[in-house]
Amino acid sequence: MVLNDAVIGVPYTIRDIQTDDVELDAFLRRLGCYSGQSVVVVSRNRKGCVASILNNRYSIDADIASAIII
């Protein structure tokens, strides 16, 4: 399941980040988005979702959210 498919308000554990883009992978790691970390989708809109990672909220577009496997 990818982050786009997550139910709002339910905590999930990140299993993997599937991207060939080294810069995107490094960026997500700096945000605390890596395997084993907890993530909760707070809200969703047409362009993506707002996710809580390490007690911080981030607006994540749909393309990036589809690379986050939960």
Language-model segments: what does each one mean?
Residues 1-2, 70:
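Absolute protein N-terminus
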Residues 4, 15, 40-42:
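Conserved positions in beta-strands of structured domains
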Residues 17-19, 30:
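A structural micro-motif recognizing beta-strand termini
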Residues 42-70:
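C-terminal structural segments of small proteins and small subunits
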Residues 23-27:
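Short alpha-helix capping/helix-loop boundary micro-motifs
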